[in-house]
Each structure stands twice: as structure tokens, then as C-alpha cells.
């Protein structure tokens, strides 16, 4: 993997979360509710890295458990 900036890595992670979420047939709202949020703002913003919003390690751990995938899958370009 080339040297990535944090911004590039956050974008890759967001794209991968969106990809795996869609593969599992979940909407942003479904994922948000499963993570314990009442709205899609965290998921929708972080998936597209809107205004610097990104997933933190706790988010990624929860998402990997919900989607039943390895957390490392989110880091693959």
C-alpha cells in the first residue's frame, strides 16, 4: 500500500463501508440504527467524508460486527 494521507485513508474507509453495507442489503438508516444512532448523519457523512466526518475505530469495530466482516477489509484500497 502506498503512503496515504489521512484524508485519502478516510475516503477509502468510507467507500469500503458503503460497499460492504450495500452488499449486505442494509440502508444507511439500518446500519445507523444497528450502531445505536437514531439518524443517518454519522454514517452518511463518514461514507463520503463530508466536512471531515469519518469513522473512528469504535465505529469500525461496531460496523465489522454488524456486517460480519474483518475490520481490515475497510482499509483495503
Region locations from a protein language model:
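Conserved hydrophobic/aromatic packing and binding residues within compact polymer-binding modules
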Residues: 17, 31-32, 42-46, 74
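Recognition helix of helix-turn-helix/homeodomain-like DNA-binding domains
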Residues: 37-53
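Residues within the helices of the helix-turn-helix
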Residues: 18, 29, 61
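The alpha-helix within a helix-turn-helix
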Residues: 21, 32, 64
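Short, basic-rich loop-to-helix N-cap that marks the start of a DNA-contacting helix
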Residues: 49-65
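Short C-terminal boundary/hinge segments that cap the last helix of small helical domains
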Residues: 57, 68-77
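A short, Lys/Arg-rich alpha-helix, primarily the initiator
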Residues: 1-24
Amino acid at each position: 500500500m502506498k503512503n496515504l494521507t489521512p484524508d485519502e485513508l478516510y475516503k477509502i474507509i468510507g467507500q469500503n463501508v458503503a460497499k460492504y453495507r450495500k452488499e449486505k442489503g442494509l440502508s444507511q438508516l439500518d446500519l445507523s440504527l444497528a450502531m445505536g444512532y437514531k439518524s443517518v448523519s454519522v454514517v452518511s457523512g463518514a461514507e463520503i467524508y463530508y466536512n471531515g466526518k469519518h469513522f473512528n475505530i469504535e465505529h469500525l469495530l461496531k460496523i465489522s460486527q454488524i456486517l460480519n466482516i474483518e475490520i481490515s477489509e475497510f482499509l483495503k484500497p
